[in-house]
Amino acid sequence: MEEKKETAQMTQETTPKDSRVIEGVRRSSRRSHAEPHSPKKAYEVRDRRQKRSLERDQHEDGTPIKRARLPREQSSTRKHPIVLLSREIPEYHTETMPTPKKNYKLIPEQVTELSEYEIERLNNIKENAKFLQSLKLLETASSLRSPPKKQNQTRGIKREKQTKVERQPIIRRSMRLQRIDPSGAPLPNVIQPPEPLLEEHPVKPPGPLEMVPTNLKGDCISVEEFLKTWASTSKESLRSLKKQPSKDFKRYTACLQTMTLREETVAKVVQNRIFSVAIHPSESRTIVAAGDKWGQIGLWDLADLSGNDGVYVFEPHSRPISCMSFSPVNSAQLFSLSYDGTVRCGDVCRSVFDEVYRDEQDSFSSFDYLSADCSVLIVSHWDSYLSVVDCRTPGTSCEQRASLNMRSARTTSVHPVNRDLCVVAGAGDVCIFDVRQLKKKAQPVLSLTGHSKSVASAYFSPVTGNRILTTCADDYIRVYDSSSLCSEAPLLTAFRHNNNTGRWLTRFRAVWDPKQESCFVVGSMARPRQIEVYNESGKLEHSFWDSEHLGSVCSINAMHPTRNLLVGGNSSGRLHVFHD
């Protein structure tokens, strides 16, 4: 007992006065490694263990030690819980004991002792947190973040949101045996004929249609002002058309470098994919037109700053408008041709779309002016027919119709000097016909060879007609010499060009520039998106591109006849106007 008292006094001297002692003892059922074999030794071992346990659970004066069990979730196992043994703390320890931290709760009978290492670790954590807070890293990171990029505001008409159609659940039972329809009504005994299906885009009625915009509701003042502007600019354009095209090629290429695209010269003009583009020949006012997939014609006056951004949408057709042109003689008239089998003339002076030619049993593909005064048209049909239409005669029929020895007729172009000749592009062949020899089964005067796939377009050069430009699906653009059409038209240039637009883009159609008939413009599949200008030798003269405002493929393009102005239309109904 004296030895135990001495060891207790030594432990009290080494233990700091300002700390409380909590001992954790895990009850264990471990047996000793050396088990006695005799019963007498076994009893002696048992007595020694009981004596040690009694001494461990009592104070020196014989009072029992209070026990505190940890909660079940804090104990490692249910079989061996951790027991905290707390000794009664003398009175002189409470005065010198340090105040506990906020995160620790002091139990009257239990106090957790922290080692010097743990106290130093907590102090280091606090100092590191204060140091990181003094650096202000979060404020610096938030200030370095770039501001959100401003989105370009969409000009013109807005995209219509399609309403979602909720589908009714399918009832898994026999309606036929119950003699009821899907709505639950009893079926009649007499079988009635099915009701005709309503078309989403019905065919327009025959006869003239009024020029009433579909994107404006009740705003008659702006419509009247636009029509007056169109009529007044048409009178001025007659003088500008008399100018001859420029012969200075260096000056022409220099002007191409000055043409740029701006945010205010991009607008959505129609709702769907653009199939044709036309430019008003006025030099004082910029008016462009676009025809889309479902018969809409969008007219855009770039100088009009009204609430509709100068965009006026009309619906004279019900199917794709594949060809459209302002009359070279009277620019107050806009001719349009559609797949629905109609050719109409939009007369701004009378505010109507007159019907020039109608054939409901057939589908039209293209047209051109056969006479110099633009009173006679030649129309190509998809099923390989040519029709001659005189706009001066009453009615909506044609004067002459001939079947071509071709699989189809996609485009037709009249020779600008010898107007009895026209070139027709079809499915794999390009032929030149003499209109005077058109019969029920017309034979071509000349055929242009070398095309291995379908030809999208073929056009005479706009001034002399000495060149023929073709765009083919075999990824080639070809230029033929048509100065002498007696025996053959030799191939001058054939260069590779990616014409594989796919299903959802309008096919490329390379067209001549009226200001420089040795150059032509065509869309491109290259990135960044661009519109390309080539000369007749196949050399790339210039590429129009703008990474900020031009982000799509412009399949259909057109050049102004006298001004440095280019218009490109894409498959979402937008027009992009490049000008100096």
Swiss-Prot record:
<dbReference type="GO" id="GO:0005634">
    <property type="term" value="C:nucleus"/>
</dbReference>
<feature type="compositionally biased region" description="Polar residues">
    <location>
        <begin position="142"/>
        <end position="155"/>
    </location>
</feature>
<feature type="repeat" description="WD 5">
    <location>
        <begin position="450"/>
        <end position="490"/>
    </location>
</feature>
<protein>
    <recommendedName>
        <fullName>WD repeat-containing protein 76</fullName>
    </recommendedName>
</protein>
<feature type="repeat" description="WD 2">
    <location>
        <begin position="316"/>
        <end position="356"/>
    </location>
</feature>
<dbReference type="Pfam" id="PF00400">
    <property type="entry name" value="WD40"/>
</dbReference>
<feature type="repeat" description="WD 1">
    <location>
        <begin position="269"/>
        <end position="310"/>
    </location>
</feature>
<keyword id="KW-0677">Repeat</keyword>
<feature type="repeat" description="WD 4">
    <location>
        <begin position="404"/>
        <end position="443"/>
    </location>
</feature>
<dbReference type="GO" id="GO:2000001">
    <property type="term" value="P:regulation of DNA damage checkpoint"/>
</dbReference>
<feature type="region of interest" description="Disordered">
    <location>
        <begin position="1"/>
        <end position="82"/>
    </location>
</feature>
<dbReference type="InterPro" id="IPR050853">
    <property type="entry name" value="WD_repeat_DNA-damage-binding"/>
</dbReference>
<comment type="similarity">
    <text>Belongs to the WD repeat DDB2/WDR76 family.</text>
</comment>
<dbReference type="InterPro" id="IPR001680">
    <property type="entry name" value="WD40_rpt"/>
</dbReference>
<dbReference type="InterPro" id="IPR036322">
    <property type="entry name" value="WD40_repeat_dom_sf"/>
</dbReference>
<dbReference type="InterPro" id="IPR015943">
    <property type="entry name" value="WD40/YVTN_repeat-like_dom_sf"/>
</dbReference>
<feature type="repeat" description="WD 6">
    <location>
        <begin position="500"/>
        <end position="544"/>
    </location>
</feature>
<feature type="repeat" description="WD 7">
    <location>
        <begin position="548"/>
        <end position="580"/>
    </location>
</feature>
<dbReference type="GO" id="GO:0003677">
    <property type="term" value="F:DNA binding"/>
</dbReference>
<feature type="compositionally biased region" description="Basic and acidic residues">
    <location>
        <begin position="15"/>
        <end position="76"/>
    </location>
</feature>
<feature type="repeat" description="WD 3">
    <location>
        <begin position="359"/>
        <end position="399"/>
    </location>
</feature>
<feature type="region of interest" description="Disordered">
    <location>
        <begin position="142"/>
        <end position="165"/>
    </location>
</feature>
<comment type="function">
    <text>Specifically binds 5-hydroxymethylcytosine (5hmC), suggesting that it acts as a specific reader of 5hmC.</text>
</comment>
<keyword id="KW-0853">WD repeat</keyword>
